[in-house]
Every structure is written in structure tokens, then in C-alpha cells.
């Protein structure tokens, strides 16, 4: 009798976990009933024509950063595209990368890159 109850409880537990997962994915991916509140507006075109127009209209006699269209003296002086969530790390060879800010301390992302370059990470 106890083994029957254990099987029933196990089946109920599995069913509830499966239902919770399906609800998560349904909510995560829209579940087929997405609401659109865009009154008459459309998404931007998926080609690069708008970017090309901005590129061609930008005046710069130095280096034009491809991601931000900032005019700078050297490529490694280009600002990050999303400075609120990215840290810029200069690699020392005249190049730089923008990486997601990580952790809780300022400069932690740069520290991790330096450790990786030294083979310690």
C-alpha cells in the first residue's frame, strides 16, 4: 500500500515539475499569444542601408569607429557602443575590446582579461 502511495506522489511530483517547465517556456517564448502594442510603427529594416547612410554622412578626417561612428585619432580610442554595461580594455598592442561589465567590483573584467592573457585563468 505504501509503495502505491509513493508511486502516486512521485507521478504527481513529476507532473507538477513538467507543468512548471512548460509554463516557463510558454511565458518565455510568447506562447502563441503575443500582444503587440505598436500602434502603426514598424520595425527597422533588416538591411544595413540606414547604417550606410549615417556612415556616409559622418564627417571625419581621422579614424571613424565602425560601431559608434565616433571620430578618433586611433582605432583603440573608439568608445564602447554600450558604456553603461561594457568596460573598454586596451590590450597594449594598439587594440582594445569592449566586454560586459562583470561582477561587483569596478575593473573586474579588465583583471580577468589580464589573468587570461597570463594563462592564470
Swiss-Prot record:
CDD domains, per database record: LCL2-like
InterPro entries: LCL2
Keywords (A to Z) from UniProt: Signal
Single GO BP term: ERAD pathway
Signal peptide coordinates: 1-20
Family, per entry: Belongs to the LCL2 family.
Main function: Probable component of the endoplasmic reticulum-associated degradation (ERAD) pathway.
Name of the featured protein: Long chronological lifespan protein 2
Gene: lcl2
